[in-house]
């Protein structure tokens, strides 16, 4: 679990950029070192803990895991957003599915069906089910997940990230009142996306 200001996957990028900055400073001077300092700052910003924009809210007739009528909330994460993923509810991972796919721009409507993706089906103690899917984009060519089947997650727990430009989809049953709409800005671990009616 990652509770720090930067997720652990980011430290290697930050450290590498700072190392190169030091090497360039002593080898070639300040002017050559500055771009690497800027790069380290960018990596710190990118891998911070967390945001995104609601790309769409779609009604579905059925979902393989949730079962029955449901609602899909699609959150687009640009290169400037945080690509850290958090569990929307406390529960056990009952289903996990990874699909190899394309790397189309994450804002395209068809990415949920065509792009590389990793889906988790989570069920709480009362039998309430949701699915959350990490979807890679044109720059995001690595989906990272630190959880697996049968793991228990707490609400808001960081469980993975998508590196550089992506989309996240959340599918909830129709008895959830969705509190966001297309175009809304959301922040991971803070914004409430829905409430059970």
Language model feature labels by segment:
Residues 1-197:
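Contiguous, well-folded functional domains in the mature portion of proteins
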């Amino acid at each position: 679990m990652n509770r720090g200001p930067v997720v652990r996957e980011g430290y290697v990028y930050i450290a590498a950029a700072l190392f190169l900055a030091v090497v360039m400073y002593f080898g070639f001077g300040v002017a050559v070192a500055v771009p690497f300092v800027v790069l380290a700052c960018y990596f710190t910003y990118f891998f911070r803990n967390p945001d995104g924009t609601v790309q769409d809210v779609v009604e579905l007739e059925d979902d393989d895991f949730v079962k029955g009528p449901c609602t899909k909330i699609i959150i687009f994460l640009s290169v400037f957003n945080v690509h850290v993923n958090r569990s929307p509810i406390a529960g056990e991972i009952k289903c996990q599915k990874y699909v190899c796919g394309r790397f189309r721009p994450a804002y395209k409507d068809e990415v949920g069906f065509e792009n590389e993706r990793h889906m988790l089906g989570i069920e709480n103690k009362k039998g309430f089910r949701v699915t959350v899917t990490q979807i890679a984009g044109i720059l995001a060519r690595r989906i990272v997940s630190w959880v697996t089947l049968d793991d228990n997650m707490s609400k808001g727990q960081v469980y993975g990230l998508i590196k550089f430009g992506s989309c996240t989809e959340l599918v909830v049953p129709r008895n959830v009142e969705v509190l966001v709409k297309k175009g809304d800005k959301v922040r991971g671990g803070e914004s409430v996306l829905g409430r059970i009616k």
